[in-house]
Amino acid sequence: MSTILECKDLTYSYGKKTALDKVSLNLESGKIVGLFGPNGSGKTTLIKLITGMIHDENNMIKVCGEEIGEKTKAVVSYSPDRVAFKRDRKVNDLLDMYELMYEDFDRKLAEENLKKLNIEKEDYIGKLSKGNAEKVQILLTMSRKAGLYILDEPFNGVDPVARESIIKIMLGCVPEDSSLLISTHQIGDVEQILDEAVFIKEGKILFHRSVDEIREETGRSLAETYMEEFR
């Protein structure tokens, strides 16, 4: 088992406000990990640093053994918390775009998932329901052969039926030697598929542990443990 993500004593500030305070975090290959914390806890900043959207001048993050840069952008596949595609784009346009942008994009896998979800390639993003537009974004993200997949609030405004479909996409696409990091407030929807959970508060990691261990030691579900920690 190899280390996919490594953060060591990572600190990041916006002016005088500290967003992350000496964060150390390792994610191993083959793991599905939940990242949980209230708004303003540092989740978004951490994701932006991992994806290279903002820069850590001290280079305290590595993905697949590489410092954040062009090489890591090629092995990190990221889905933001909002659908990022223009409404006048057809689904097929997005397939073409991903095929051009990413050498590791598996178009056949993406098209197979579209059929399973009853989404047509000629459909316009703006004509799809919010749930279906979210599904398209996630299946495109998961159709790359990446080392680390990051989904930020994949269930944002999505109904329970659509959430179930999105979870099936996640599980059906992630390779065994990759890692999947999911940041969501919908803990109950993902608890059963998680190997590990990371709780973050005020820029600090409260704990990073096996979900099974948390249940066994607390006698509570992960969602209940979260409520206890952050009430």
Where are these regions (language model features)?
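ABC ATPase "signature
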Residues: 208-209
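Catalytic Walker B motif of ABC-type/P-loop ATPase nucleotide-binding domains
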Residues: 149-153
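ABC-family P-loop ATPase nucleotide-binding domains
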Residues: 81-136
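Conserved ABC transporter NBD signature motif
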Residues: 58-72
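The feature captures the beta-strand-to-loop junction immediately N-terminal to the Walker
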Residues: 36-38
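Helix-to-loop junction immediately C-terminal to a conserved catalytic motif
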Residues: 51
